[in-house]
Structure formats: structure tokens, C-alpha cells
A protein has these predicted regions:
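Gly/Gly-Pro- and Ser/Thr-rich, intrinsically disordered tail segments characteristic of DNA damage-repair
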Residues: 1-276, 282-286, 445-502
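DNA-contacting surface of Y-family translesion DNA polymerases
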Residues: 8, 103, 229, 239-410, ...
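Short, charged/polar surface micro-motifs in flexible loops or helix N-caps
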Residues: 12-14, 38-42, 345-350, 420-424
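Short, well-ordered secondary-structure micro-motifs
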Residues: 191-192, 351-354, 425-428
Length: 502
């Protein structure tokens, strides 16, 4: 079988680069951060330009951290400035390098998610000039995988030259530069891009391209740390590995030879993927990804609140989310037979002494290592598949009341419609034989069922009309009374994409 060649392309600081280009600025020479300052300085930064990152600023930190780091960097510049005095500011990296008397400044650009999606679509059209859609997997808004195995002979180019040709076309078309990784499988091209390319100098256009095969991976990355730099190795997996004496991928590979059972004991079936990656193997192809069909499907909605909510106010938000999720089901022609609700509590429940004294339940740690009350989680089943707003809203409200601690502040919530199917594929009710008895009024039952069917049909017409109006006039063209109550978030979220300004 012919050896495969894959290219992974990551658009450099994508959101920040778009904002620079729209201002006529060079993304490689401009200090800019994409963040919604109206949400306070605790808001997460969606992107940071490379020049601003050079001051030790994380690409996904919070705005107050950016301001603090710039303040610290300016303190250092002042010490080294002539007369220990800074005179003027600049957000251009080249000016700051040339003039030590200038203070570091930066632009805060509010996010425009719809605009970034438009840019991403334009860039995807560039990829299509070179590669067929069946050989492209869109990994995220700013990252793709390309199977270029059958294109190298066609273009009479090496993988490196083809990657460069595509990236320079993107640069010419949009002004956005990129980093690329080339590998003999999807894992290796991703790791080449994420790890190796970061440690090689960029060319004059800011482009970095790195290559890996299995043997080069073992030679160069078996000793690399930290483990979390590797694709699909999160903090939880890395912590377990380190607790068992494995600090590098080389350690994992060695363990797989000497004590494979330990890895399966720690990670179950997921150990197979970890072992493969430790050796630089990845059998999954783009063709396999394209052909994959999950055995079970779901639709979900999640939200992190800007501040802690009392349970009753949080219930309002859950009802709003459920209402919109049901409309999404109807719009897609889907039905569900199970709703799942997860409620995450706020750190204030344990940092506030009075609240902590009242709480005696289980405690867990959030992603930042802080103690919080254990999240609430539950599910509720229907006797058949449905997309009825009335039925689903009642079920989720009942589930909320059942699982949520009424004394705790809520910070995050997730609503999931499970086992979704196309309505035409859903099992029909009353399809089998019915056991008759002498004590049931079947005429009354039949009338009751007719009334229920009529109510569902009326509801379906209302749902269809609501969707039609929202599509024509915008998501906020029709609002319910609950959307106008104090603490409601749907109206604002309707103007967002992915929780950020559209």
C-alpha cells in the first residue's frame, strides 16, 4: 500500500490576525488581543497576536492577565530606558524594538464570530483550489487536515512545497499566515505542527513548516516534555501517567513493552490510542473519518454564566436553553427519547465561609484546581421519541428540581437531547398488540389520545411558524415572556455565536 502523506494547517492567531488585517495592520508586527472587554477583565482572550505573545502572554489567558503582564514588561522597560523614563506608547513590535523609551501598548478588539466564519470560508475555498473536499477534514475554524498522498505526483511537488504553495495562496488572498505540519499519519502531522514547528524559525512571511515520520518522531519527541503538548493528552491523562512514573512519550512506549496491562488498567480501552501515539502510529485515515457514522446521536447546549445564579434564576436559563434546543430539533426534523441535565456549581459556595458551613456534600476540583461542590447530573426518559416543547420543557424542569441543591449557587449548565433520530425513523407507538381489560374506558382513552394528537399538531404548527419568522427576521424577532425576566440570557445569546459576539 502507498505510504500516506498528510498536511495539517493552522492559521496563525486566526481571530487576532483577521482583526489586524481589517484595520490595515500587519498581524506579525501588531500587539492585539481579541476579547470582549464589556464582560470585565476576567473575560477569556480568544486570540493574541504573536508579537504580544512574545512578552510571555498566553494565547488563551484572561484579559486581566494580559494587562498585568504588559504592566510588568513595561516596568522592566522603564528600568532599562534612558533616564529610567518611558515617553509615549506603541502597539507596533518593530517600533518598540527600535525605541526602548516607548511603553508597550496593545489593541483590544471585541470578537466578531460571524466575520471570522466568513474569513474561514474564504480560506477553505483556497484549499479547494488544490485539494478535493473528500480529502479535507475541517478540524476547527482555523485548522484543517489534508490527505495529499495522491496530489504530489499531480503537482510534481514535495509535500513541503505543496504546503508552502497553499499557505502563500491563503496569505495572498486574506493576509493570514499559517503554520503547517507534514506527517505519514494524522497524529504525526498534527504533532509536527503543534510541537516541532514552534521550535523552528519562521520565514519572512511568518510561515513555519515541520515534518515527521515514525522514526523521526521517536528520535526527536520521545524525550519531549510536557506530555500535555501532545495531541489528545490532557492534564488528567498526563497526571495519571506522571503518578506512575511516565513523564514522556518514550516512557509510555517503554511501559507498553514491559507492562502494557498497567496502561489498560489506568485508561481502559483508551490505552490503545495512547500506546499507538507513543510509537507514532495512527491508523485512522481521512477516508475513515468521512465514512464514520456514530451509533448514537445527540444535540446539546451549554452555557457558563457571567456570575453565580441562585437556583431559581438558573432554572429560568435552563428553560430558555431547553426551549431553543427543542426548536433546533424541530428545525432538523429530529426527535429524542431522553433529556440529560448537568449543573455545575460556583466556587463561591466554598470560598464564602457562611455558604461553606451550610454545605456537607461531596467536593471536586474545577479545571483550575479549585474546590467546588460536586456537579449535579441526571436524565429523564420519555415513553417514545418526541420534539414537543411542552413535554420536553416539563421534563427538564422536573429534572432540575430533582437534582439541583437549592442552597448552592450555579455557574454552568448543560442540556442534552439524547438518542436523537430523524422523525421518520422513530419507532411508532401502539404498533403491537394491546392487552384488553374490563375496567378501562377505551372510548374515553381514544378521545384523550385524539385530543393529545390535536394539541401536538397545534404545537408543531406554532413551532414551524416560530422557526420561519426567526429565520426571516432574526432570532430575537419572537421572544417569550421568560426571555424578558431578570437573569434571562437567551436574548443576548441569540446575538452570539459560540458564546461570543457575532
Amino acid at each position: 500500500m502507498k505510504d500516506k502523506t498528510y498536511i495539517a494547517i493552522d492559521l496563525k492567531s486566526f481571530y487576532a490576525s483577521v482583526e489586524c488585517r481589517e484595520r490595515g495592520l500587519d498581524p506579525l508586527d501588531t500587539n492585539l488581543v481579541v476579547a470582549d472587554e464589556s464582560r470585565t477583565d476576567k473575560t477569556i482572550c480568544l486570540a493574541v497576536t504573536p508579537s504580544l505573545k512574545s512578552y510571555g502572554i498566553s494565547g488563551r489567558g484572561r484579559l486581566f492577565e494580559v494587562k498585568q503582564r504588559v504592566k510588568e514588561a513595561n516596568a522592566g522597560r522603564q528600568l532599562n530606558a534612558p533616564g529610567h523614563r518611558l515617553d509615549g506608547t506603541s502597539h507596533f513590535f518593530s517600533e518598540l524594538q527600535a525605541n526602548p523609551s516607548l511603553a508597550i501598548d496593545f489593541i483590544i478588539a471585541p470578537p466578531r464570530m460571524a466575520y471570522y466564519m466568513e474569513y474561514s470560508t474564504r480560506i477553505y475555498q483556497v484549499y479547494l483550489k488544490y485539494i478535493a473536499p473528500e480529502d479535507i477534514v475541517v478540524y476547527s475554524i482555523d485548522e484543517v487536515f489534508l490527505d495529499v498522498t495522491d496530489y504530489l505526483n499531480t503537482y510534481q511537488l514535495s509535500a513541503h512545497d505543496l504546503a508552502m504553495k497553499i499557505i502563500l495562496d491563503v496569505l495572498e488572498t486574506t493576509g493570514i499566515t499559517a503554520t503547517a505540519g507534514i506527517g505519514t499519519n494524522l497524529f504525526l502531522c498534527k504533532v509536527a505542527m503543534d510541537i516541532v514547528a514552534k521550535h523552528i524559525p519562521a520565514d519572512k512571511n511568518g510561515v513555519r513548516i515541520a515534518e515527521l515520520d515514525e522514526m523521526k518522531f521517536r528520535r526527536e519527541l520521545w524525550t519531549h516534555q510536557p506530555l500535555t503538548d501532545f495531541w489528545r493528552v490532557g492534564r488528567g491523562i498526563a497526571k495519571k501517567l506522571e503518578q506512575n512514573g511516565m513523564f514522556t512519550m518514550g516512557d509510555v512506549a517503554l511501559c507498553s513493552e514491559r507492562n502494557e496491562d498497567l496502561l489498560y488498567k489506568l485508561f481502559g480501552k483508551n490505552a490503545e490510542l495512547l500506546i499507538d501515539h507513543a510509537w507514532g502510529w495512527e491508523p485512522t485515515t481521512i477516508a475513515a473519518i468521512k465514512a464514520y457514522r456514530p451509533s448514537s446521536n445527540s444535540l446539546s447546549s451549554g452555557q457558563v454564566l457571567h456570575c453565580p445564579y441562585e437556583p431559581q434564576k438558573a432554572k429560568l436559563v435552563v428553560r430558555e436553553m431547553t426551549d431553543l434546543l427543542v426548536l433546533d430539533l424541530v428545525d432538523k426534523g429530529l426527535v429524542t427519547d431522553q433529556m440529560v441535565l448537568t449543573i455545575g456549581y460556583d466556587i463561591e459556595n466554598l470560598t464564602d465561609q457562611a455558604r461553606r458551613a451550610r454545605y456537607h456534600g461531596a467536593v471536586e476540583k474545577d479545571p483550575y484546581g479549585r474546590e467546588i461542590p460536586k456537579q449535579a447530573h441526571g436524565s429523564i426518559n420519555f415513553d417514545g421519541h418526541t420534539s414537543s416543547t411542552r413535554k420536553i420543557m416539563w421534563a427538564v424542569s422536573e429534572l432540575f428540581d430533582r437534582i439541583v441543591d437549592k442552597n448552592l449557587l450555579v455557574r454552568r449548565m448543560y442540556v442534552v437531547a439524547n438518542h436523537v433520530l430523524p422523525e421518520a425513523d422513530a419507532p411508532k407507538k401502539n404498533g403491537g398488540a394491546v392487552q384488553l381489560d374490563l375496567f378501562t374506558d377505551y372510548a374515553a382513552e381514544e378521545e384523550k389520545q385524539k385530543a393529545e394528537d390535536a394539541a401536538l399538531e397545534r404545537e408543531r404548527k406554532i413551532q414551524a411558524a416560530t422557526l420561519a419568522i426567526k429565520k426571516k427576521y432574526g432570532k430575537n424577532a419572537i421572544l417569550k415572556a421568560m426571555n424578558l425576566e431578570e437573569g434571562a440570557t437567551a436574548k443576548d445569546r441569540n446575538a452570539q455565536i459560540g458564546g461570543h459576539k457575532a
